[in-house]
């Protein structure tokens, strides 16, 4: 899969997922306590006095330079699928996947971060809040990332 295909796949996924959430939530996909730092993610009808606001899907502001800095900080390159996941839209998922808001675009990845796992070929990207499990990409078959499983 090319970078363009990975990004289009993620774009299609997010748009369908949020559309489904909006249908289930009577027009509201996700409600979150959003502050001023994430104002770009507020839906247009949000009241600034309310702590909880409807979260709208917006294009990611994460740049290639941001990804390069993250990769340098964590000591490994991101597979295309995770790169696309982080760079197509700012999004929110329940744990363990977590959120990717404007104010902290790598929040979920940093929350799951464990250098020992990376040293042994696993890239953590999601962590259950209760600490019961970490979701990782098995990097054993890189650069053939289509053969890299999720564990």
Where are these regions (language model features)?
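Compact, glycine/acidic-enriched structural inserts
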Residues: 148-151
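A surface-exposed partner-binding patch
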Residues: 1-141
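Short, charged/polar, Gly/Pro-enriched secondary-structure boundary elements
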Residues: 143-146
């Amino acid at each position: 899969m090319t970078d363009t295909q990975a990004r289009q796949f993620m774009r299609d996924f997010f748009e369908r997922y949020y559309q489904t959430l909006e249908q289930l939530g009577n027009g509201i996909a996700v409600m979150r306590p959003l502050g001023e730092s994430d104002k770009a993610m507020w839906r247009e009808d949000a009241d600034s006095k309310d702590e909880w606001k409807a979260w709208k899907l917006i294009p990611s502001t994460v740049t290639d330079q941001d990804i390069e800095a993250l990769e340098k900080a964590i000591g490994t390159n991101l597979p295309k699928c995770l790169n696309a996941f982080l760079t197509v839209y700012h999004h929110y998922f329940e744990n363990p996947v977590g959120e990717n808001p404007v104010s902290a675009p790598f929040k979920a990845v940093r929350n799951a971060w464990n250098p020992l796992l990376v040293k042994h070929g696993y890239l953590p990207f999601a962590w259950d809040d209760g600490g019961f499990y970490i979701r990782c990409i098995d990097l054993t078959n890189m650069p053939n990332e289509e053969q890299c499983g999720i564990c």
